[in-house]
Regions:
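Hinge/lid segment of periplasmic solute-binding proteins
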Residues: 42, 114-179, 221-225, 327-338
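Early extracytoplasmic/lumenal segment of secretory-pathway proteins
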Residues: 47-51, 56-118, 293
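Short, solvent-exposed loop/beta-turn-alpha elements that line the ligand-binding surface or hinge
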Residues: 131-155, 198, 223-224, 230, ...
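Extracytoplasmic/periplasmic solute-binding protein
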Residues: 162-175, 180, 203-258
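Extracytoplasmic/periplasmic substrate-recognition and gating elements
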Residues: 275-282, 318-396
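Long, aromatic- and glycine/proline-rich binding clefts that accommodate carbohydrate-like moieties
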Residues: 332-339, 385-453, 457
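Conserved C-terminal helix/tail region of periplasmic/extracytoplasmic solute-binding proteins
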Residues: 420-529
Length: 529
């Protein structure tokens, strides 16, 4: 005889089985990693092979610094072998990491940016949160069991380490820091009848740039006697837009990933840029090429580029990308980027950071952390900072006597002590408190790209005879939203639940109803008895 108890029991089992099946189906293809926990000790009886992905263009000195750091580290830890893989572009590192996440073949240690890390973190326990490693008394920052002199947490430049906090945890350590500088042909500015102010303003740069467009009767430009003159060239237009918005207190994005860039201030900025691009007074790297080349050839007055590119700026620069016969002798000045409010300077902080990827073996992760931490030692920090207009990320290195001696010898030669390079570093050292970074979230890389794309599109449009009006800007905003999928980030209506989720929730609901029915049935039966 089929009893009520059996009916309910069978129905309950079926519902639970269906719910379990759907739950497993929903997880098909997902890769789960256990969260990393710091081991009590580092097992030095085992051998570890770790990979380190880093960026380098053509600077052989930087490559040698990485190689020397690896060699020195392996002498301290002979049971750890570090394999270096160099890239010439951060974007390629980013793409390769994304590709390798799905196959669990990420590198152990990687030079990267917080924007990129935010995307890596969409995977499950992919990037190691470093808080517990920072504070570990044995192997953390300044730990007692380390075989090298590591900085303590308090010896980081505060602004630089805070840039590596994503949400409530630290997911990176800073490696090097730079900012943008405006490299100015002071000779031409004065020839045009102007005197450089203490702080550059956007109004000043635009005015001088337009004045430099005056031509002689033979068609040459009056300021340089050449047929080519682009007074103002910006290398990174995403940074240009970001800083112009920040300086005016306008929206870009918030920490929650809500996109705020499509506002009236952005429209005003683009109209301003359009007017100067139309006259020929302004251009970009993507449109015209590297600003340093035009600057060194006497064909540019204001060249904005990273302080990490200072060795390419000036007619006596250690690195030149044009032939000697094209060089023009001039006095070069190094300034922060132009400002709207000189009493409240705002300049972007940039430069690579280091993240550690999670692995199945906690000992392997600890070995990776030891190497990442070794890159913070004074020897590595100072050597790498001296290759360009970088600054070390620790106060420990910045105050090291050898680094202070290096800074004091600016201009002694046009190589290690190239004056412009050291001035670029000093610019950031003097303005660290004025630096900022943009909010980091999954999608912040796309927003950054979109901010520069709007400037590029605007400049190209007016050069082709287009008109930048409200109709154009409306269309531009919609185009970049679509191109970079910006409607997918921030607060939005997620729409109805997938059918699988609806079915799963229905099964769970039925399960609880049947459980309740079974309890009631039992109570009634006991009462009758």
């Amino acid at each position: 005889m089929i009893t009520m108890k059996k009916i309910i029991s069978c129905a309950l089992s079926a519902a639970l089985l269906a719910a379990s099946s759907l739950s497993l189906a929903g997880c098909h293809g997902a890769r789960y990693r256990d969260a990393f926990a710091v081991p009590d000790t580092f097992d030095e009886t085992r051998h570890y092979e770790i990979t380190f992905w880093a960026k380098n263009d053509t600077n052989k000195t930087q490559t040698e610094i990485y190689e020397n750091a690896i060699e020195s580290f392996e002498e301290l830890y002979p049971n750890i072998t570090v394999t270096l893989r160099l890239y010439n572009d951060y974007g390629k590192i980013y793409n390769d990491v994304i590709t390798n996440i799905s196959t669990n073949t990420t590198p152990n240690v990687c030079i990267t940016y917080p924007d990129h890390i935010a995307t890596y973190m969409t995977g499950d326990n992919v990037v190691v949160p470093l808080d517990d490693l920072f504070s570990d008394p044995s192997y953390g920052l300044g730990g007692s069991e380390l075989k090298f002199d590591s900085p303590s947490f308090d010896e980081f430049v505060p602004q630089f380490i805070e840039e590596c906090r994503l949400g409530t945890n630290y997911y990176a350590i800073p490696y090097m820091r730079s900012t943008e500088a405006c490299y100015v042909n002071k000779t031409y500015v004065e020839a045009l009848g102007y005197e450089l102010p203490e702080v550059l303003t956007w109004d000043f740069v635009w005015e001088v740039s337009e004045a430099a467009m005056a031509r002689n009767d033979d068609g040459t430009f009056a300021v340089n006697g050449q047929m080519t003159m682009i007074p103002f060239i910006y290398k990174s237009t995403d940074n240009m837009m970001i800083q112009m918005l920040r300086q005016q207190g306008a929206g870009y994005s918030d920490a929650g990933g809500n996109i705020e860039i499509f506002n009236d201030t952005t429209r005003e900025i683009l109209r301003e840029i359009a007017s100067h691009a139309e006259s020929g007074a302004f251009s970009t790297f993507k449109i015209s090429s590297y600003p340093g080349n035009f600057l060194n050839a006497g064909q540019c007055i204001f060249a904005v580029d990273s302080t990490a590119g200072a060795t390419w700026m000036g007619s006596s620069a250690p690195h030149l990308d044009i032939s000697a016969d094209k060089l023009v002798d001039f006095e070069l000045a190094v300034y922060p980027v132009p400002q709207y409010d000189t009493s409240n300077m705002q300049m972007i902080s940039q430069g690579p950071s280091i993240c550690v990827f999670n692995k199945a073996d906690p000992q392997e992760v600890l070995a990776s952390w030891l190497f990442a931490q070794y890159l913070l030692t004074n020897e590595v920090q100072i050597a790498y900072a001296e290759t360009e207009g970088y600054v070390p990320v620790t106060l420990k290195a910045q105050n090291d006597p050898s680094y202070l001696d290096y800074l004091s010898r600016a201009g002694e030669d046009d190589d290690l002590h190239y004056a412009i390079k050291i001035q670029a570093s000093q610019l950031l050292l003097a303005n660290a408190q004025n630096t900022f970074v943009t909010p980091v979230f999954n999608g912040s890389t796309s927003l950054r790209d979109a901010s520069g794309q709007m400037i590029e599109n605007t400049a190209k449009s007016v050069r082709r005879g287009g008109v930048v009006d409200d109709e154009y800007l409306d269309a531009l905003f919609e185009d970049v939203k679509s191109m970079y999928h910006l409607d997918e980030y921030g607060k939005k209506d997620l729409g109805p639940l997938p059918k699988t989720s609806v079915t799963l929730l229905t099964c769970l609901g039925i399960t609880w109803v049947l459980i309740g029915a079974y309890v009631v049935y039992g109570a009634v039966k006991r009462k009758k008895e």
